[in-house]
Swiss-Prot record:
Chain positions covered by the region annotation Disordered: 1-21, 138-169
Ranges for domain LIM zinc-binding: 236-299, 301-361, 364-423
Stated name of the protein: Testin
Chain coiled-coil ranges: none
GO molecular function term, any single one: zinc ion binding
Role description: Scaffold protein that may play a role in cell adhesion, cell spreading and in the reorganization of the actin cytoskeleton. Plays a role in the regulation of cell proliferation. May act as a tumor suppressor.
Main localisation: cytoplasm
One Pfam entry name: PET
Length: 423
């Protein structure tokens, strides 16, 4: 792949900018009524408020389940999905756990229940319940709670649909579609996994069973002695925090990492963003756990404009980020900026004409917009052209460049006398 480098002007400004004037207007189910939501046709943001879709997204449950179902399709985790008879689309079979208050229900008193929108897919409900209690309270996916909202946001952030489904991407070429399909197939076979919740003692017992099967001719007394000594020495430490796990507490295992490693439930996190791996879905690479987004980021450049992975041979690098050539464009007019001069406005690239028209500061002297390539003097929220025609004493018109001055509400004075004369 090769990259081009456009030219940035160093002008800084605090003004906000409007969304691009183009775009398909379609209001998705997660947009609130009355907000004037308009979806930009490839930026995945609102054209009116510039809020990124991934931070606004609250997908419907069936949309979430379709996305995760597609992720698990053609993997060893097909037991976690079911295909609808109507369209054959794989759906994620989330394990929903409902707990009833153990206190005996009294007459005319409703039974108190707690519903977890997701729980580890284990048969032992006590194990699942213990796992949930080891998570931070604000991250427990109890229906209607902050934790449930956290899970939904992480589903959107960690597992973007456009990282696995070419149809969710913007105008991929046939070659790019094929390359993306191969990329997805590769990470499904080499990196994707789902954590297992187990008791460390249970895993150790399984290891002992395998060990004893391999030494079936050893004397029983010796085998018993060795097992006792090994049990006393066994300590289970978390692969993330290195602290030991307490006896009787569940841990998470990742098959890709090997069952000699385990994690506390709250430590099963992405090594890049530090967030809990949503629904224990992980990607394993070079001894580290990743969420889907950051695993893909470690393999492919991601466009800062559309948030999609870049499969084309050429792309642009600017502002320490990568961009599709067609997506590094003015945030106001959508004109491509590759090889052109631009100005960053609230972390968004804007072409010079749009900057002058929509965002440039106004000179207090001549009341014209200040060109981004022209030097200026700024004090608090006021600016002047750094010229002998504009940066003058508001009373006697003395040039103040390189001189001391007294600012007063958009005016500048060369002396106390001039200030008094204008007061």
């Amino acid at each position: 792949m090769s990259a081009t480098h456009p030219t940035r002007l160093g002008t800084r400004t605090k003004e906000s900018n409007a969304c691009a004037s183009q775009g398909l207007v379609r209001k998705p189910p997660w947009a609130n009524e009355g907000e004037g939501f308009e979806l930009h046709f490839w930026r995945k943001i609102c054209r009116n408020c510039n809020v990124v879709k991934k931070s606004m997204t609250v997908l419907l449950s069936n949309e979430e389940d379709r996305k995760v179902g597609r992720l698990f399709e053609d993997t060893k985790y097909t037991t976690l999905i079911a295909k609808l008879k109507s369209d054959g689309i794989p759906m994620y079979k989330r394990n929903v756990m409902i707990l009833t208050n153990p206190v005996a229900a009294k007459k005319n008193v409703s039974i108190n229940t707690v519903t977890y929108e997701w729980a580890p897919p284990v048969q032992n409900q006590a194990l699942a319940r213990q796992y949930m209690q080891m998570l931070p309270k604000e991250k427990q996916p109890v229906a209607g709670s902050e934790g449930a909202q956290y899970r939904k946001k992480q589903l959107a952030k960690q597992l973007p649909a456009h990282d696995q489904d070419p149809s969710k991407c913007h105008e991929l070429s046939p070659k790019e579609v094929k390359e993306m399909e191969q990329f997805v197939k590769k990470y499904k076979s080499e990196a994707l996994g789902v954590g297992d919740v187990k008791f460390p003692s249970e895993m150790n017992a399984q290891g002992d069973k395998v060990h004893n099967c391999g030494n079936r001719h050893a004397p029983a007394a010796v085998a018993s002695k060795d097992k006792s000594a090994e049990s006393k020495k066994t300590q289970y430490s978390c692969y993330c925090c290195k602290h030991t796990t307490n006896e009787g507490e569940p841990a998470i295992y990742a098959e890709r990492a090997g069952y000699d490693k385990l994690w506390h439930p709250a430590c099963f996190i992405c090594s890049t963003c530090g967030e809990l791996l949503v629904d224990m879905i992980y990607f394993w690479k070079n001894g580290k756990l990743y969420c889907g987004r950051h695993y893909c980021d470690s393999e492919k450049p991601r466009c800062a404009g559309c948030d999609e992975l870049i499969f084309s041979n050429e792309y642009t690098q600017a502002e320490n980020q990568n961009w599709h050539l067609k997506h590094f464009c003015c945030f106001d007019c959508d004109h491509i900026l590759a090889g052109k001069i631009y100005v960053m406005v609230t972390d968004k690239p804007v072409c010079k004409p749009c900057y002058v028209k929509n965002h440039a500061v106004v000179c207090q002297g001549c009341h014209n917009a200040i060109d981004p390539e022209v030097q200026r003097v700024t004090y608090n929220n006021f600016s002047w052209h750094a010229s002998t025609e504009c940066f003058l004493c508001s009373c006697c018109s003395k040039c103040l460049i390189g001189q001391k001055f007294m600012p007063v509400e958009g005016m500048v004075f060369c002396s106390v006398e001039c200030k008094r004369m204008m007061s």
